[in-house]
Amino acid sequence: MEDEMQIDKKEVEIEQKPPRFEIKKWNAVALWQWDIVVDNCAICRNHIMDLCIECQANTDSAAAQECTVAWGTCNHAFHFHCISRWLNTRNVCPLDNREWEFQRYGH
């Protein structure tokens, strides 16, 4: 039976073709974003990564350097300055009307 199943063990030479192209230099680029569905502040309508309207108007002030994002326990995100002004009048989330509680804020 072994005689019937002999395998030809000749080495096959594979012809090496030159590569179609060669990468000589590669500049990697990365992109990231906040893990939230809505990327605009619902109060000022600016992109959450941009300055809020208050900081855009006062670019000379130190507050513009501290324009951060604030998340509530409901997972809605707003500019810290925007939600702070909102909370002076009503202590609820502007989007779902639940009582506002800070989950985290900062970059």
Curated annotation (Swiss-Prot):
- Summarize where Zn(2+) 2 binds, as residue positions: 74, 76, 93, 96
N-terminal signal peptide: none
Please state where this protein is localized: Cytoplasm; Nucleus
A single Pfam family it belongs to is: zf-rbx1
List the InterPro entries: RING-box_E3_Ubiquitin_Ligase (IPR051031), Znf_RING (IPR001841), Znf_RING/FYVE/PHD (IPR013083), Znf_RING_H2 (IPR024766)
Which annotated residues bind Zn(2+) 1? 41, 44, 79, 82
Example GO molecular function: zinc ion binding
Alphabetically list the UniProt keywords.
Answer: Chromatin regulator, Cytoplasm, Metal-binding, Nucleus, Transcription, Transcription regulation, Ubl conjugation pathway, Zinc, Zinc-finger
GO biological process terms, semicolon-separated: heterochromatin formation; protein ubiquitination; SCF-dependent proteasomal ubiquitin-dependent protein catabolic process; ubiquitin-dependent protein catabolic process
Protein function: Component of E3 ubiquitin ligase SCF complexes, which mediate the ubiquitination and subsequent proteasomal degradation of target proteins. Seems to recruit the E2 ubiquitination enzyme, like UBC3/CDC34, to the complex and brings it into close proximity to the substrate. Component of the rik1-associated E3 ubiquitin ligase complex that shows ubiquitin ligase activity and is required for histone H3K9 methylation.
Free-text comment on this protein's domains from its UniProt entry: The RING-type zinc finger domain is essential for ubiquitin ligase activity. It coordinates an additional third zinc ion.
Give the quaternary structure: Part of a SCF E3 ubiquitin ligase complex containing psh1, pip1, pcul1 and the F-box proteins pop1 and pop2. Instead of the pop1/pop2 heterodimer also homooligomers of pop1 or pop2 may be present in the complex. Component of the rik1-associated E3 ubiquitin ligase complex composed of at least clr4, cul4, pip1, raf1 and raf2. Interacts with cul3.
Q: What is this protein called?
A: RING-box protein pip1
